[in-house]
């Protein structure tokens, strides 16, 4: 195949432009990214060689070599990893088939992002960091097991690249960076050493470089030979310690080392919220270095998001995405697990069924949850910041992880009628504040605190001094299906079913008044129910309203307005369900409508008012009305009539 010139995908062109012109505060990370890519490539061939040893081609002296050439002005990164085919080169470099590309470019456009070039690794496009320091990049690669069918790729970062076949004896990848004049310092030994030490010291493969030293010859006694002159000697030196950070005692690892390793495996640019480093012995033996991030990633709720911990078996890399090590509600957790018990030829099927994996998962989950409980106890403000980022994900565990339900419900935080905006309460604190007469834990679900705070469903609870939890995350609708009780107190939705807040004594006092209201408004309510029969399941007098005229209430186990909105937003089918229209017997509109009804049951105002009440109930719960034009016309007519009386 002759040399072919191709255009980058549109997104890559935009990305290259941003990388070249916007990132400037820490260009050192280009080398970290390329070394990390080489390390990943060696990981992959070691793993694949378990089932196909021929891929090694007799070359298993793993290393990543850095070759600075001051005369040519080039820095070369060479590895003997898995390599790539021509198709893989085009797929991995010529295009970006990743949903996060636009989010990455938007982040770069933000002013703050120009000071955080580490973002480039976070979004999985680390190779392009080369163009921060180079005006020409050449890549030559051959995949293991493909004879001499190599590939040469070249670009000057102008939106196009050339690609052609080439003959390569060696397996792996070589990247040659033609450095811009202002970045020739990256050819200096001291500069390369400092970058490798800072960012790649823990890479488990040797990062090597030829070092030339001037020496005076020594005699057999080890002393320099007088008058012998000097000679130049070149040796290949290893620049990194290669000691797996998770295998070292905690006392020997500095905070800076923990933080740099986290950034290496996560491509995050912030320090982690918490670091968990421990060893497990007994039935299942493993070492783990686990990180809880400080900020949620942009793709946390994307279905195709890559997740899972890195898995090693006796220091041998197995996979960087072992999803079986943690449940899905902990998918934001980063880290490494190194097991002593799993077989080296472990397969995906084995991972899904292996009893050791299940034991490791149980231990990891327990350690993570206990760590969070400790932070919550000792530094609540810090924990609140973490909860704001990851609370919606952690709450998924209340629905799916029955074994850890009690631990998770102690970690859960909620806003409520008793907290300020942005402040939270736990279920334990809620129960401790409950008045003696209160029997249940009350909550309401919706899309925001602002909407829920003015909900008419809260009126009776406010009057009684009963606190109501605000559940504003979409996942909460599923959470409350599982979290039905806490400390023998049942959880009750204030917008579902009937409410019974009165004591027996209060019920007796109100019974006469309620009976009178039923007699006075019974016929009117029957009329309203009949008129709205295609929209409501029933109409009845309310025990929960004190100020508002009406509200809509779902059945005890029915679909409420918030669940309807969520299902529609997810393009899921919404079951046919009508709610109950509750009417406030103490509201003046009830007396007005009753007087009209007694005078003339055919009065058009009755149907207009019934429609207005229903639409009003929809609006107060945040639901759309079906005929906004008619609604506004009726309201306008009422305003005119009121003004001309």
Swiss-Prot record:
Name the SUPFAM superfamilies for this protein.
Answer: ATPase domain of HSP90 chaperone/DNA topoisomerase II/histidine kinase, HSP90 C-terminal domain, Ribosomal protein S5 domain 2-like
Record note on quaternary structure: Homodimer.
> Annotated region C: where?
566-645
- Region annotation (A) maps to 1-348
PROSITE patterns reported in the protein's UniProt record: HSP90
Gene symbol here is: htpG
Q: Which Pfam families match?
A: HATPase_c_3, HSP90
The family annotation for this protein states:
Belongs to the heat shock protein 90 family.
Q: Where in the cell is it found?
A: Cytoplasm
- Alphabetized InterPro entries for the sequence: HATPase_C_sf (IPR036890), Heat_shock_protein_90_CS (IPR019805), HSP90_C (IPR037196), Hsp90_fam (IPR001404), Hsp90_N (IPR020575), Ribosomal_Su5_D2-typ_SF (IPR020568)
Keyword Zinc-finger annotated: no
Q: Read off the HAMAP family from this record.
A: HSP90
Organism lineage string: Bacteria, Pseudomonadati, Thermodesulfobacteriota, Desulfuromonadia, Desulfuromonadales
This protein's name: Chaperone protein HtpG
Q: Name one GO cellular component term.
A: cytoplasm
- Answer whether the UniProt record assigns the keyword Repressor to this protein: no
> Entry's NCBIfam families?
PRK05218.1
Q: What does this protein do?
A: Molecular chaperone. Has ATPase activity.
Q: Which Gene3D superfamilies match?
A: 3.30.230.80, 3.40.50.11260, Heat shock protein 90, C-terminal domain, Histidine kinase-like ATPase, C-terminal domain
Positions of region (B): 349-565
Single GO MF descriptor: unfolded protein binding
Q: Which domain of life is it from?
A: Bacteria
Keywords, A to Z, come to: ATP-binding, Chaperone, Cytoplasm, Nucleotide-binding, Stress response
